Swiss-Prot record:
Binding site for Mg(2+): 81, 83, 154
PROSITE patterns: 25A_SYNTH_1, 25A_SYNTH_2, 25A_SYNTH_3, UBIQUITIN_2
Biological process, per Gene Ontology: defense response to virus; innate immune response; interleukin-27-mediated signaling pathway; purine nucleotide biosynthetic process; response to virus
Lineage, top ranks: Eukaryota, Metazoa, Chordata, Craniata, Vertebrata
Name the record gives this protein: 2'-5'-oligoadenylate synthase-like protein 2
Expression sites by tissue: Strongly expressed in spleen dendritic cells, whereas, in bone marrow-derived dendritic cells, the amount increases during the maturation process. Expressed in many organs, the highest levels being in thymus, lung, and bone marrow.
Family: Belongs to the 2-5A synthase family.
Amino acid sequence: MDPFPDLYATPGDSLDHFLEHSLQPQRDWKEEGQDAWERIERFFREQCFRDELLLDQEVRVIKVVKGGSSGKGTTLNHRSDQDMILFLSCFSSFEEQARNREVVISFIKKRLIHCSRSLAYNIIVLTHREGKRAPRSLTLKVQSRKTDDIIWMDILPAYDALGPISRDSKPAPAIYETLIRSKGYPGDFSPSFTELQRHFVKTRPVKLKNLLRLVKFWYLQCLRRKYGRGAVLPSKYALELLTIYAWEMGTESSDSFNLDEGFVAVMELLVNYRDICIYWTKYYNFQNEVVRNFLKKQLKGDRPIILDPADPTNNLGRRKGWEQVAAEAAFCLLQVCCTTVGPSERWNVQRARDVQVRVKQTGTVDWTLWTNPYSPIRKMKAEIRREKNFGGELRISFQEPGGERQLLSSRKTLADYGIFSKVNIQVLETFPPEILVFVKYPGGQSKPFTIDPDDTILDLKEKIEDAGGPCAEDQVLLLDDEELEDDESLKELEIKDCDTIILIRVID
C-alpha cells in the first residue's frame, strides 16, 4: 500500500474506493493495535501501582477508557492514535487532579521505563507539555512488531467525575456546575468526559465515520505534513466535530450521502471559519443557571467557537492556526476530489444553528420563531410585522442576565450581539414622536416603554404601574443618580431614545 496516497489526485466520485483501499484499517494492523493496548492496560491494572505508595496512599485503577480514533471507531490504516484514560482513586475532585497530576505522571513514567521489557514492545516514553503548563499526559511511542509503523498512545490520568455511565446517559447538571466552578484551564479536565466524547462519535453511522476518516487523512497528510508536527494548528477533534455538524445540517443526519459532497461541505466551513459557532445540548444544556450563564458567556467569545459536546469549558476553536487551515481548505476545493460536486449538489450548512427567539409583547401571548443568527435583524422584524400586523415602527430589545437592555439594530445580525442561543426579545410599536426608554427594576431586569417626549415623569410612572409595576406614588425614578420630578417632561429633562431610567420602589 502507498503510505501517502494522493487525495488531491483522486476524483470526488472515486473517494469511496480511495477510502476502502487506502484508509480503512486492515485486520492485522487493528489486531496489533489492540494487542498493544491490552498489554499496556494490563500493566496499569496489575503492575504499575502494586506495592507502591503514591501521594501517601495506595492507588487503585477505577477504570480504563479508550479514547482517540481507536475508541471512536475512526482509525486510519497504519496511523493509530489511542488515548488511554486512567481513572485513579487518588483523584477525588477536579482540584485534586490539578494539584497532583504532575506527580502522578512522573510516577507512571518511572514505572513504565522500569517495567517496559515486560510489555513485549519497544516503547519510548515522552512527556507531553503544552507551553509552560504542567504536563497532563504521557505519550508512548510504541514500535510495531510486524512493520515500521508506530502506534502512538497518550496516557491521561483523570478524576472519575462521571462514575458508572451508560451510552445514553446524561450527566447530572451538578457535575458540570462543579466543573465550571473549579475554574481550570479551558478543557483541562476533558479526559474525565472521554466516555461521552467517545459515545458522541462511536454511535454515528458507518458512512459518517468514513467521512471522518477522510477529513482526518486530509488533516494529517495535506495539512499537518505541510506545516510540520510542531506547528500550532487546531486539533483533529475540532475538525471531527465540524464534520459531524456539517453532516447533521447538510443531510438531516441521514446515513445516505455522497462522500465528495460531505467533504466539500467541511472544506467550505473551514474556509469560513471566522463565522463558525457550534455547540450541542446532548450532555449539558441551558436549564441549570450556572451552566446557562457560562454557556452564554462562551458563545459570546471570539469565533470560531466549537464547544466540546461533553465539556463546555473546552472550546476547540480557541487554538491558533485557523488561517493555515482555511488556506489549505480553499486550495483543496480547487482539486479534483472536490470539483465533481456541482452547485445544486452542495449541502446547505449554516455557520451556526438557527436561534430560537421568543417574541414578547405586553398584553399578548408569547410567540416563537427561529432565525439564522447571521441573517439581518430587519428580516426578523419583517416576519414579526407580518405575524402581528404592525403598522408603526418596530423597536425590539433584549437583555442578558446581569447585563443592560439593548436595542437590536435592523442593520445588524444576532451574531453581531453574540446571540447564538435561545433569547427573549421585547417588541414595542412606536409612532412619531414617541421614543423608547428602558426602565431598570430593582432586581436588575429592564423593561422597555414607549412614551411621548412631552409626557411627564408621572405619565411614565403610570405606564410602569399599568405594566404590573409598583403604584406610581411608591416609585422613585433616577437618571444619572438624580431623582426625576413628577411634573417635569422627558423633553425638559433631555431624556433621549433608549436611555435607561432606574426605578426604586419606596416602601413606607
